[in-house]
Structures are given as structure tokens and as C-alpha cells.
């Protein structure tokens, strides 16, 4: 968490966060989630490493963190630039759904070699479930749900048909991001969509951090709204932050 909510520059890292990354920023500040995260840590283990890929495994077919919309996450004290977060595909429309075929398959798909990707990746294995693959590059993330062949081996990847209407826009953006990743090996800033509400969310996040730190209403008002307007904007005990 940001230890000094009064330092506006301490929130500069949020300027280009996507919607999924903003979700993490707010979730990691939830005390009940932090407690749930601590109790779930023995559920996961590290299978090993393959080039730039870290391989994780969950003991349960349905990880307990799904109650919070997650399959896995690193520690809540890590901000969106450094955290590893697997969102539940049922809740996160940007998770790209794909099928992996062997190289010998006669399909129109370019071979995909995970080792050729320059940015870091994490592979989460869930018993009796599909593979979950996350690419992370300087705070930008792309999450894939992959069925079929093991993606750590050379495969051919195809998207799982036309997405539903309510998922189409997010899936097309993720597919564009994946195609650029396949070509360049990186997740460029232009390939990950910044949430247009970021300036507003940054302000809300500062207010939340101030409240969590125990700051009073007048103190928050003086810092965020300017001292001369604090009493006017923040008067009245019934007004919510």
C-alpha cells in the first residue's frame, strides 16, 4: 500500500493502468482479502522454471481465492506494476481463451514457442482444468486460458471461435495484444488499453488510502481539495468519502 497518501507523485504509477490492474489496486487494500490470501498460501506450489516461465500448481480444482474473483495472486503488498494476478476467466472478460494444437496439426496457425517470448510469464496448473498463462511486462499483463496441448512445448494456438457479444470487444483487444506479443516478444504500452477513468480512480484511491491510514475528514479535505475549500466541501458527518 502507499504509506504516504499525501504524496501525489507516489501514485504516478497508476497513470496507465488497465481495468484489471485497477481492480487489483482496490482489492489488495481489502483487509478481509488480505487475510484470505494468507490462509490460502499453502494451497500453491512452484513446479519449476522453464526459460522465462515460472510454473505454479494449485492443489484444488477450484482455488479458494475464486471467492475473490482470483485463481492466484502474489502478495497484496505488491502494486499492479509488480504483482502476479490470475483473474477468474468467468469474471474477467479480457482473459483470452485459446486452444493449443500439436505442431503436426494441419491448421492455419503460426507455431508458438513460449521460450521465444522475451517478457516474463507464469503458468498456473489447476487439477482437471485448462492451463492458465500470464504474461507480465513492466506492469502490463495478458492472461490466457489454454485448452489442449501443453503450452510449454511448441504448439499452434487458435482462439476458441467467435466470442459472445458481451465479450467481443475485450477479446478482440486481447487478441490484438497477443498477436503483437507473438511478433515482438513484448507487451508494448500501446497494446494494453489504459482505463479512461484512471485520473478519477487515482483520486479515489488516495482518499481510500487516507481513510485506511486513519486520517480525519478535514485533513483529507485540506490535502485533496485545498485548505481554503476543506470546510465547505467536507462539512457534515453524514457525507461519505
Please place each PLM-identified region on the residue numbering.
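Mixed-charge (acidic/basic) macromolecular-recognition segments
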Residues: 157-232
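DNA-contacting interfaces and partner/effector-binding or oligomerization modules
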Residues: 1-155
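DNA-recognition helix of helix-turn-helix
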Residues: 231-241
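Short, surface-exposed, charged/polar-biased interaction segments
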Residues: 43-44, 54, 199, 228, ...
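Short, charged/polar micro-motifs that form catalytic or ligand-binding hotspots
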Residues: 12-27, 190-197, 206-210, 238
Amino acid at each position: 500500500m502507499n504509506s504516504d497518501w499525501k504524496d501525489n507523485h507516489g501514485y504516478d504509477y497508476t497513470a496507465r493502468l488497465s481495468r484489471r490492474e485497477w481492480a487489483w489496486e482496490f482489492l489488495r487494500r481489502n483487509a478481509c482479502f488480505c487475510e484470505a490470501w494468507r490462509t490460502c498460501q499453502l494451497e500453491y506450489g512452484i513446479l519449476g522454471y522453464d526459460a522465462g516461465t515460472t510454473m505454479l500448481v494449485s492443489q484444488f480444482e477450484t482455488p479458494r481465492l475464486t471467492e475473490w474473483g482470483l485463481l492466484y495472486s502474489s502478495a497484496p503488498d505488491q502494486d499492479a506494476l509488480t504483482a502476479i494476478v490470475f483473474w477468474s476467466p468467468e469474471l474477467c472478460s479480457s482473459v483470452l481463451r485459446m486452444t493449443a494444437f500439436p505442431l503436426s496439426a494441419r491448421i492455419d496457425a503460426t507455431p508458438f514457442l513460449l521460450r521465444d517470448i522475451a517478457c516474463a510469464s507464469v503458468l498456473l496448473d489447476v487439477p482437471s482444468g485448462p492451463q492458465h498463462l500470464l504474461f507480465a511486462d513492466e506492469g502490463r499483463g495478458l492472461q490466457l486460458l489454454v485448452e489442449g496441448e501443453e503450452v510449454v512445448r511448441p504448439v499452434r494456438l487458435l482462439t476458441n471461435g467467435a466470442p459472445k457479444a458481451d465479450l467481443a470487444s475485450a477479446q478482440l483487444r486481447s487478441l490484438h495484444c497477443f498477436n503483437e506479443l507473438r511478433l515482438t516478444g513484448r507487451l508494448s504500452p500501446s497494446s494494453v488499453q489504459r482505463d479512461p477513468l484512471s485520473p478519477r480512480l487515482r483520486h479515489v484511491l488516495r482518499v481510500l488510502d487516507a481513510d485506511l491510514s486513519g486520517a480525519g475528514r478535514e485533513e483529507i479535505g485540506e490535502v485533496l481539495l485545498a485548505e481554503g475549500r476543506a470546510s465547505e466541501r467536507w462539512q457534515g458527518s453524514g457525507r461519505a468519502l
